[in-house]
Amino acid sequence: MRILLLSACLLAAGPALAADDASSCAEGITMIRDALALNPPEAAVPKLKNALRVAEREQKEGEFDECLDAVADARKVLGR
């Protein structure tokens, strides 16, 4: 019985977690665009552009976990 209850809770929480990932992905893409607009160091530009390209592609595909991985890569480049 507990397993059924746990499974039902996880299934019900799924869409909410996906919505959080989707909004975090969109916020991350905005953060990367803003960072590029502020003229970052020359060495960071290609890495940020790559992270932005990957994040945007994964957002379109609905792969928000992979989008968040690209955003995390951009944060590392920026030292955040």
What does each model-identified segment do?
Residues 1-18:
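Classic N-terminal secretory signal peptides
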Residues 56-80:
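Mid-chain, structured segments of secreted extracytoplasmic proteins
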Residues 1-3, 34, 76:
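Hydrophobic alpha-helical segments, especially transmembrane helices
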Residues 19-48:
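Amphipathic, heptad-repeat alpha-helical segments
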